[in-house]
Amino acid sequence: MELLCCEVDPVRRAVPDANLLHDDRVLQNLLTIEERYLPQCSYFKCVQKDIQPYMRRMVATWMLEVCEEQKCEEEVFPLAINYLDRFLAGVPTPKTHLQLLGAVCMFLASKLKETIPLTAEKLCIYTDNSIKPQELLEWELVVLGKLKWNLAAVTPHDFIEHILRKLPQPNEKLSLIRKHAQTFIALCATDFKFAMYPPSMIATGSVGAAICGLQQDEDVSSLTGDALVDLLARITNTDVDCLKACQEQIEVVLLNSLQQYRQDQDGSKSEDELDQASTPTDVRDIDL
């Protein structure tokens, strides 16, 4: 008889280093170097002839779904998108290679941020085996060369803890604000309009949008409106008007995402109604 052990070792993480989080020099260094890792142009206009913005959105959504299903660290997806955009900003790429490029970028980001990284074989399965592990490994070297091995890019997640530490928030609310901000950061990564925004602005706008959204349901902050935006802008040395515009765009992206989700749910419900005669009604009401 074979025994199956279902216990899984917890992911090992270092505890937050107070010396880093409470030293403003760390935040200033991040602000100084963040733009080094941004794509240098809107590559759809001057580099890519075969790839369109909607294709980038489709592969980014697929990458997000893979990262969510594999329970990757929050930093993996935005970092992988950073690699994708930087590569596409410099290398004309046929659309038939876009999913391969996305898989390679997740492969690299996972190696950098995960304790147990994604494997080449697993990523190939997510492409319905349209690419082979050897092909992915070969492209890994291509991408590394084009990025000049500069993989430790600054992402919006690098700023989250520095921002939250400086806000007059009760500790019990910070985890919820953090979770919502991380969701907004992921949504921004799927939309190309945010590709050339500084990571600090996306992080600050995401935190602001998270607090404003939560304030509609409960009191999470003593700051509201312009006072909150002014404080966030001071923390990351961001122009107030630019920050307001960024936060508004983040809220629009969230609204569009929710509307799309509801449409998908309505479409799924309509399909379910077609086979209602063969399925007990109460089964449909169960929320899994």
Curated annotation (Swiss-Prot):
Function: Regulatory component of the cyclin D2-CDK4 (DC) complex that phosphorylates and inhibits members of the retinoblastoma (RB) protein family including RB1 and regulates the cell-cycle during G(1)/S transition. Phosphorylation of RB1 allows dissociation of the transcription factor E2F from the RB/E2F complex and the subsequent transcription of E2F target genes which are responsible for the progression through the G(1) phase. Hypophosphorylates RB1 in early G(1) phase. Cyclin D-CDK4 complexes are major integrators of various mitogenenic and antimitogenic signals.
Subcellular location as annotated: Nucleus; Cytoplasm; Nucleus membrane
Keyword Transmembrane: no
Family matches, as SMART domains: CYCLIN (SM00385), Cyclin_C (SM01332)
Subunit-level organization: Interacts with either CDK4 or CDK6 protein kinase to form a serine/threonine kinase holoenzyme complex. The cyclin subunit imparts substrate specificity to the complex.
SUPFAM superfamilies in the record: Cyclin-like
Pfam families listed in its UniProt record: Cyclin_C (PF02984), Cyclin_N (PF00134)
Molecular function, one GO term: cyclin-dependent protein serine/threonine kinase activator activity
UniProt name for this protein: G1/S-specific cyclin-D2
GO cellular component term of the entry, any: nucleolus
Post-translational modification: Phosphorylation at Thr-279 by MAP kinases is required for ubiquitination and degradation by the DCX(AMBRA1) complex.
PROSITE patterns listed in its UniProt record: CYCLINS
Modified residues (Phosphothreonine): T279
Gene Ontology terms: biological process: adult locomotory behavior; cell division; cellular response to X-ray; G1/S transition of mitotic cell cycle; long-term memory; negative regulation of apoptotic process; positive regulation of cell population proliferation; positive regulation of G1/S transition of mitotic cell cycle
Tagged with keyword Phosphoprotein: yes
Family: Belongs to the cyclin family. Cyclin D subfamily.
Residue(s) carrying Phosphoserine: S270
Region of interest (Disordered), ranges: 264-288
Domain Cyclin N-terminal residue range list: 26-151
Organism encoding this protein: Sus scrofa
Domain of life: Eukaryota
CDD domains found in the cross-reference section: CYCLIN_CCND2_rpt1, CYCLIN_CCND2_rpt2
Alphabetical list of PANTHER family matching this protein: CYCLINS
Keywords: Cell cycle, Cell division, Cyclin, Cytoplasm, Membrane, Nucleus, Phosphoprotein, Ubl conjugation
